[in-house]
C-alpha cells in the first residue's frame, strides 16, 4: 500500500478494511470498518480531512480531496463508482455515486440517493433523501424507489464481500502465457444484475 504521513498526520485504516496496493492515502485520511478502496484510488488528505465510513467502497481510479477545514465524507455504506471525483463534499448514508461523476465543494448528497454516471453536481448543492440526480449540472429527476435501493444495496454488498475476498485471496503473481484448460470463471456473491437486465 502507498500510505504516507504528511506533516506528521498519518492515515488511519481499520484492520478490516481492504486497500489495494496501487491506491494512495496521504495525510488526514480515516478509513472505517469493512471499507473497500480499489486500484489507483487517490485519497489526498493534505488540506481537508477525508473520511470513508464503515461498509463504504471507493472503486478504481476514484479521487477524494478537499479544502482546508472542509471534510470530504462518504457515509456508511456509500458506493462510489469507478473514476468518480469527490471534492469537499458529503455523500449521504447508503447513497451511490455513479461512474465518472464529479461532486463539488460543499455539495451534500442526501441519504439513499443515486447520482447517475457522468453527472456533475455543482458546488453548494443541497440534496434531500432518496433523490435520483442526473446530468450536468445534476438535477433531481425522480425519487428513488424501494426497488432502486434493493439494487443499490446488492451492489454495495458485492463490494463488502469483495473486501473480505481480497483480504483472503488477492495475490500478486506473474501471468500465464496461455489460458489453462477448463479455466475457472470468477463470480460475485449475490445475484445482482446490470440495470436494464
UniProtKB/Swiss-Prot annotation:
<dbReference type="InterPro" id="IPR050484">
    <property type="entry name" value="Transf_Hexapept/Carb_Anhydrase"/>
</dbReference>
<comment type="similarity">
    <text>Belongs to the transferase hexapeptide repeat family.</text>
</comment>
<dbReference type="InterPro" id="IPR011004">
    <property type="entry name" value="Trimer_LpxA-like_sf"/>
</dbReference>
<protein>
    <recommendedName>
        <fullName>Carnitine operon protein CaiE</fullName>
    </recommendedName>
</protein>
<comment type="pathway">
    <text>Amine and polyamine metabolism; carnitine metabolism.</text>
</comment>
<dbReference type="GO" id="GO:0016740">
    <property type="term" value="F:transferase activity"/>
</dbReference>
<feature type="region of interest" description="Disordered">
    <location>
        <begin position="177"/>
        <end position="197"/>
    </location>
</feature>
<keyword id="KW-0677">Repeat</keyword>
<comment type="function">
    <text>Overproduction of CaiE stimulates the activity of CaiB and CaiD.</text>
</comment>
<dbReference type="InterPro" id="IPR001451">
    <property type="entry name" value="Hexapep"/>
</dbReference>
<keyword id="KW-0808">Transferase</keyword>
<dbReference type="GO" id="GO:0009437">
    <property type="term" value="P:carnitine metabolic process"/>
</dbReference>
<feature type="compositionally biased region" description="Basic and acidic residues">
    <location>
        <begin position="188"/>
        <end position="197"/>
    </location>
</feature>
<dbReference type="InterPro" id="IPR023446">
    <property type="entry name" value="CaiE"/>
</dbReference>
<dbReference type="Pfam" id="PF00132">
    <property type="entry name" value="Hexapep"/>
</dbReference>
